[in-house]
Amino acid sequence: MLIKFTKMHGLGNDFMVVDLISQHAHFRPEQVRRLADRNFGVGFDQLLIVEPPGRPDADFRYRIFNADGSEVEQCGNGARCFARFVKENRLTNKKNIRVETKKGIIELIVNKDGLVTVDMGAPRLAPADIPFVAETQEAIYPIEVNGVMYEISAVSMGNPHGVLVVDDVNKAPVHKLGKALENHPRFPERANIGFLQVVHRRFAKLRVFERGAGETLACGTGACAAVVAGRLRGLLDRKVEIKLPGGNLKISWEGEGHPVMMTGPAVRVFDGQVRI
């Protein structure tokens, strides 16, 4: 069957977006992997699905599948693209859009300048909520990889993140160490791994090795988790600009119990049809 889709990106983190309100389909993991292939398929980091909400306080249901076919809880860059998609496709005329994810409700705001602000909700820091194997909640945890000890912060932004502070993101072993930490036994559900370089209290650089996708040009939840980790370590102010390989995001966080706010672009690349 033929399915209509839209190719979008947020800072180079690219998505295939499918409206399953006006059309019907079911994506099996092997189909997602085939579509994600950049040589033989559409090519994307994640597949984003727009569905009717399953609860009365939401406007839509938002589902995310990684390129390896696994379904994940959250994607910040995808959320911005989701907001622009439902507005431009006239699926809603609301300015503030409430979206149901696997880990709860997030709120999306399409600004007049075309940027999208996402209320990502409050970060979860208790080890059991991330999940991360630790006896008590700390800002920094020692973690061993191949006999070497590292210091990591563990944060959930609806999906699990580990954040390391590095001197230079360009020299950080993102692929080797990122893969090892993604699959570390202390992250039972695997994790996205961020490498954070603090330039000054309101500006930082970040590279992210995403769970199930590898390093991407940008990771919205990773940027949020990095600011939370930086704030918990006393390195960052409440409003920070994060420079990722694909561009910049503005992140703000007042502190524990408060939501993380993320603002950045969402770009529509093209519309197409594909047979599944």
Swiss-Prot record:
Pfam families xref list: DAP_epimerase
Catalytic residues in the record: C75 (proton donor), C219 (proton acceptor)
Its EC number(s): 5.1.1.7
Site positions (Important for dimerization): F270
SUPFAM superfamilies: Diaminopimelate epimerase-like
Reaction equation(s) it catalyzes: (2S,6S)-2,6-diaminopimelate = meso-2,6-diaminopimelate
GO biological process, one term: lysine biosynthetic process via diaminopimelate
InterPro entries: DAP_epimerase_AS, DAP_epimerase_DapF
Record pathway: Amino-acid biosynthesis; L-lysine biosynthesis via DAP pathway; DL-2,6-diaminopimelate from LL-2,6-diaminopimelate: step 1/1
Binding residues annotated for substrate, in chain numbering: N13, Q46, N66, G76, N77, N159, N192, E210, R211, G220, T221
Site entry: Could be important to modulate the pK values of the two catalytic cysteine residues: H161, E210
Entry keyword set: Amino-acid biosynthesis, Cytoplasm, Isomerase, Lysine biosynthesis
UniProt superkingdom: Bacteria
Enzyme class label: isomerase
Localisation: Cytoplasm
Record-level Gene Ontology MF annotations: diaminopimelate epimerase activity
Gene Ontology CC terms, in alphabetical order: cytosol
Quaternary structure annotation from Swiss-Prot or TrEMBL: Homodimer.
HAMAP family: DAP_epimerase
Main function: Catalyzes the stereoinversion of LL-2,6-diaminopimelate (L,L-DAP) to meso-diaminopimelate (meso-DAP), a precursor of L-lysine and an essential component of the bacterial peptidoglycan.
Family, per entry: Belongs to the diaminopimelate epimerase family.
Name of the protein in question: Diaminopimelate epimerase
Native organism: Hahella chejuensis (strain KCTC 2396)
